[in-house]
UniProtKB/Swiss-Prot annotation:
It is found in: Cytoplasm. NCBIfam families: xseA. This is Exodeoxyribonuclease 7 large subunit. Pfam families: Exonuc_VII_L, tRNA_anti_2. Belongs to the XseA family.
């Protein structure tokens, strides 16, 4: 035999691969029967019509997204992949999503429009507009009598009473709702009286929310110059408007929080920033005060009056040393004279007396010469020190015609920026001070 011989396992595997590759995913409508849910959480059921039936499975991670509880006898629309359970040779459907039969047709339309608009780029993230950092006014496109509007207004009044609100009333359910929503979006864009728009309504069935899945509404949102927040239904409800809008809020209340500022949080942030500013200013003032004290100390140590006092003290010390030196020499010579006089008194002989008188006269002459020489030398030293002291004295600079300007606190003025017009200035000269008032400041050109 030239034909390939399959084992049962090989045949079932081949059929499974063919089914999965050829059919992949299909939409199927039918009646539920034999519905079971074991402890694993998976759903097992049969879909049938008047002529046939097929086994189906829907795993737990998928059936958690279904918004209703399947019942036997219920007509549903499922999106499923075709497969074959190899151990028993039973072909089956692996269900990806499930909707009631009426909503199922709408879901097909939803998926088709979603794919079309996505292909056209209406969902592109880079085209979405950002909300202003702080909205001053917000528009609300919704039913004027719906609970969603009251929820939004309540949140806005609590969080940001200063926010201006403009309501664009429209139907949010029924045949005319889509056209009215488009008209209100276009009206808000023409008026340009708000910073952002909230477009939405409260929860409902897929049919109730269908106006937000219409193509005309999607295109009006896309072409809006104002940023739009979609706030349709509950968190589990997803519409075409959510994909096109610049921002999606899970509920109308959440949309109100997105466009409003929490005043309490802003006040807390303001207090925090004020505390930081005060601390920074305190640090800056302390740094500047420390630097000012250091500069004052340096100025005090380098002040001309202080230097003059130091030189004067040095001159007094030198004069004292000169006086002490001259007194010491004089006392020494007087002591020598007393010794000689005592020797003369002990020897009464005229000859000796005459000789001693001559010696005394000579010593007196020599003493006078020595005293004059020493006194002249010390005077020369003193004059030299005075000349040196005078040459380094700040008063010498004054004598040559220079002066020093100081402010009212005695701080030397070296730059124009240290004084201002109208301020009192003291100019120190060699023989006194001039007190004047600044009338003009002229920078060096």
């Amino acid at each position: 035999m030239s034909e390939h011989i399959y084992s049962v396992s090989q045949l079932n595997q081949t059929v499974r691969v063919m089914l999965e590759n050829q059919l992949r995913q299909v939409w199927l409508t039918g009646e539920i029967s034999n519905f079971t849910q074991p402890v694993s959480g998976h759903w097992y059921l049969t879909l049938k019509d008047e002529n046939a039936q097929v086994r189906c499975a829907m795993f737990r991670m998928k059936n958690m997204r279904v918004s209703f509880r399947p019942q036997n006898g219920m007509q549903v629309l499922v999106h499923a992949s075709v497969s074959l359970y190899e151990p028993r040779g039973d072909y089956q459907l692996i269900i990806e999503s499930m909707h009631p039969a009426g909503e199922g047709l709408l879901q097909q339309q939803f998926e088709a429009l979603k794919m079309q608009l996505a292909a056209e780029g209406l969902f592109a993230q880079h085209l979405k507009k950002s909300l202003p950092p702080f909205c001053k006014s917000v528009g609300i496109v919704t039913s004027q009598t719906g609970a969603a509007l009251q929820d939004i207004l309540q949140i806005l009044r609590r969080r940001d009473p200063s926010l201006q609100v403009v309501i664009y009333p429209t139907a949010v359910q029924g045949k005319e709702a889509s056209a009215e929503i488009v008209q209100m979006i276009e009206l808000a864009n023409r008026r340009q009286e708000v910073d952002a728009l909230i477009v939405g309504r409260g929860g409902g069935s897929l049919e109730d929310l269908w106006c937000f899945n219409e193509e005309m509404v999607a295109r009006a949102i896309f072409h809006s110059q104002l940023p739009i927040i979609s706030a349709v239904g509950h968190e589990t409800d997803v519409t075409i408007a959510d994909f096109v809008a610049d921002l999606r809020a899970p509920t109308p209340s959440a949309a109100a929080e997105l466009v409003s500022r929490d005043q309490q949080a802003l006040l807390q942030q303001l207090v925090y920033q004020r505390q930081r500013l005060e601390m920074a200013l305190d640090r800056l003032f302390k740094q500047k005060d420390d630097r000012l004290q250091r500069l004052r100390l340096r100025l005090h140590n380098q002040h001309p009056q202080r230097q003059l006092s130091a030189q004067k003290q040095l001159m007094q010390q030198l004069a004292h040393r000169l006086d002490w030196s001259m007194q010491a020499v004089l006392q020494q010579k007087q002591a020598q004279l007393r010794v000689l006089w005592a020797r003369v008194e002990k020897n009464p002989l005229p000859f000796t007396l005459q000789k001693q008188k001559q010696d005394l006269a000579q010593l007196k002459v020599r003493l006078d010469v020595a005293l004059k020489r020493e006194l002249t030398f010390k005077h020369h030293q003193f004059a030299a020190l005075c000349t040196k002291l005078d040459s380094i004295s700040p008063l010498k600079v004054f004598a040559r015609g220079y002066s020093i300007a100081q402010n009212a606190q005695g701080v030397a003025i070296t730059q124009l920026k240290q004084v201002s017009v109208g301020e009192r200035v003291i100019t120190r000269l060699a023989d006194g001070e001039i007190v004047s008032q600044v009338t003009d400041l002229r920078p060096r050109s």
